[in-house]
């Protein structure tokens, strides 16, 4: 496994934005070299690309465990076995439970499997024959994948923020409910004289301008 250094920015005084992490998985060293060279100048949303390298399925999974912010995996289908890439794609989703990372399968032997069936049966985002994946098409595929990753990441972040806000709102609400329950008699009538209820009512905002809090 190899991790390339993040490229420097033109302005050394400015903080460099975090690069997009792209994991190249292939047992052919030349594929790593050519892929990195083809994308060396790629920039998306002001961020460069940082390349991670794995040469087998197990190395790829280990790298993904170490880096939970990998945005894209360029994954060879045939490595230590004829379906190594397909197995890795499945384990990324089912074992690592990583639904964010974009997976682009690449194969040098298109006759080994039907593209249509792979797209339907595996949770991947694109499938290419290496001979068809020109520099221009590779760039387009990578940028589209990064855009998808960014959109999913933002959606996940917003959901987490909403859940945090709901949890914060639920605490005082639960306290009020417990206070009301503590001040309810056997018939279900709120006993306003109970200390817990008096405290809850006193803590409420005033009903009008200048009105004092309600006390019992």
Regions found by a protein language model. Give the residues of each.
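Short amphipathic alpha-helix used as the core "switch/output" element in two-component signaling
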Residues: 41, 58-65, 78, 84-99, ...
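C-terminal output helix
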Residues: 113, 131-142
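Conserved Asp/Asn-Gly motif in the active-site loop of CheY-like receiver
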Residues: 51-59
